[in-house]
Amino acid sequence: MAAPPRHEVELTSVTMRFDAADPGSLLPVLAKYVVLTRMDPACRNVDLCASVTAPGRYLLIQKWDSPDAQREHFDSATMIEMAEACRGLLSGPPDIDLWDGPSAHDLR
């Protein structure tokens, strides 16, 4: 019997690292962003992590259906609102990186 066909998963992952000048004010901004981003139909997942070794450092990990969906989100009102709300709350610009997922597979 032949093995079932493999289906390639197109997945775009993005990380955004924020170093807070005002952690108490930044955390609610990022938490709201996570909630709103999870409502986007093309968002596979988004997590907010707080560093254990660097207090005030936060990491957003996002997974998107496609590169186009990720780019569209970065131009969205949700992203713009979050970026504007971060003014004065960071010790420097966020570190944003785009990742390839060579080991990605769909759990559905």
Question: Which residues make up each language-model segment?
Answer:
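Glycine-rich beta-strand-turn "strand-cap" elements at beta-sheet edges
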Residues: M1-V9, L48-G56, M82-R108
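An amphipathic, aromatic/His-enriched active-site/gating alpha helix that lines ligand/cofactor pockets
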Residues: P5, P28, K32-R44, D65-D97
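Short, well-ordered beta-strand segments in beta-rich or mixed alpha/beta enzyme
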Residues: E10-R17, D47-F74
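Short flexible/disordered coil segments
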Residues: V14-M16, S76-A77, P102-R108
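Short, surface-exposed ligand-recognition loops at beta-strand->loop->(often short) alpha-helix junctions
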Residues: R17-L27
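Residue-level signal for secondary-structure boundary sites
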Residues: D22-G24, D68, A104
